[in-house]
Design a protein with these regions (language model features):
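Amphipathic alpha-helical polymerization modules
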Residues: 1-61, 68, 74, 81-202
Length: 202
């Protein structure tokens, strides 16, 4: 069922309003997993990753623009946000209700990056639970059907929030402590990539 939405103010935290699951893939794995836990963050290379380090999968751009949603899992790619464009650091990240991700670099102009893709199953109770809120497809669940957020039958996204059932108090505390440490550290250090990413996604 739909959990209440808790505001986190981190742009890469995504809540699903409606049906569907995010699609994740571990770098070392060929089979994707599925989750409703949208507690994501950008790594130092700009990859959008889940709390278990898996890549968040999305629809690749076509000639630099948003293209159609792939129908097969093979058509998805890990979402990667370019942290600089022509040597200018990213100044803003937007994740829209329909899954499209855009980034701006010092000006008002937003560039397409990728689009989050969701999976739907005819029988959710047939999914195999893997722990940590992630699931895998089985014969009982049926094959995944891919769609874009806000498509008919698919959830829309809310950036800057998490579904209450997916908010783990310890995770939230860890994230807050981390942010505090980075803030203290950055007062002394030159700003590194990871701090830049951290700051932008808040």
């Amino acid at each position: 069922g739909q959990g209440a939405i808790v505001d986190t103010d981190r742009k890469t935290d995504l809540a699903l309003l409606g049906n569907g699951l995010f699609i994740l893939k571990k770098p070392t794995s060929i089979t994707p997993t599925f989750t409703r836990n949208g507690s994501f963050s950008l790594d130092n290379s700009g990859f959008l990753r889940a709390s278990n380090d898996a890549y968040v999968m999305g629809a690749p751009l076509v000639d630099g623009n948003f293209g159609p949603t792939p129908t097969e899992l093979d058509g998805l790619l890990p979402i990667q946000v370019p942290l600089t464009r022509e040597d200018i650091p990213m100044s803003e990240l937007k994740i829209l209700a329909d899954g499209r991700i855009e980034a701006a670099y010092g000006t008002e102009v937003s560039y397409p990056v990728s689009a989050i893709t969701l999976g739907l199953f005819s029988n959710n109770s047939g999914l195999k639970e893997l722990g940590g809120g992630s699931y895998s497809q089985t014969d009982k669940s049926g094959l995944v059907r891919l769609g874009a957020p806000s498509d008919t039958g698919y959830a829309s996204l809310e950036s800057g929030g998490l579904e209450a059932s997916n908010v783990n108090i310890t995770d939230e505390l860890t994230a807050m402590i981390k942010a505090q440490q980075q803030f203290n550290g950055s007062a002394r250090l030159m700003q590194t990539n990871s701090e830049m990413v951290e700051k932008l996604t808040r």
